[in-house]
Amino acid sequence: MGLCPGLTTFMLEYAAEQLKKTVLEAELRIYFGAGVVSGTASIINMFEGFKDDLMLLSEREIRRIKPTKYHSDRTFTFDRFHSNMPLIFFSSPEIRTIQRASRFEELQNFDCAFHLQNLPMGIVPLLRKSSFIRKLICKMVNKQQGQLEKNEKNEKSVIVCTYVRNQNSIVKCLLHSDSSFRLTGVFCAVIVLSIIKGCIPIMPGIFTFEDININLHMLNEILKNKNINISIEE
């Protein structure tokens, strides 16, 4: 339970709470600047997340389709400095779990995508088809992180955006950070400490975020105290 899934799941549920009615459609979008330093496991997980088949929620059913048949030319505007960014759709575990959350029980459609600064979009089809190429690129990125971080043109920026909609309203939840490491570590630590302190009632077992009864406003205040500031736009 770190950045995705974890913090992104919280942002989906927090946006849904502001909507105040059942969510029918949802989107998760993440922007990674090329200067953001990430761990080896995080890099591998990111590249392995967009294999040749794409998992998404469509008409309330989990489907697997070829990425070329699903909005291959779609773009997204994160903010005024990051507009019309081409997207790489990926299979988040939240596709399988989000409907467990009470406000998402009637969810019809949900997909997840990210933009990685400076990644040539022309190489994406090859990455999807070849495990060897994915592993090769992962090794290259991991080895060159120091150089990428020093390059002033590479942004040290992570932007997380969740959208939820119903027939009448749209709510956007937005977060800016300079470190995916920090987002992952802080969210995980906050959840564990909240459980230890008794703020989150939980039985022994294995649970996803959607399974846990959490006061979302309380959790948001704790995150604010850790300088993780999430904004809401309605």
Task: Give the ranges of each region predicted by the language model.
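Short alpha-helices
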Residues: 1-16
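C-terminal catalytic/substrate-binding lobe primarily of soluble NAD(P)-dependent oxidoreductases
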Residues: 14-234
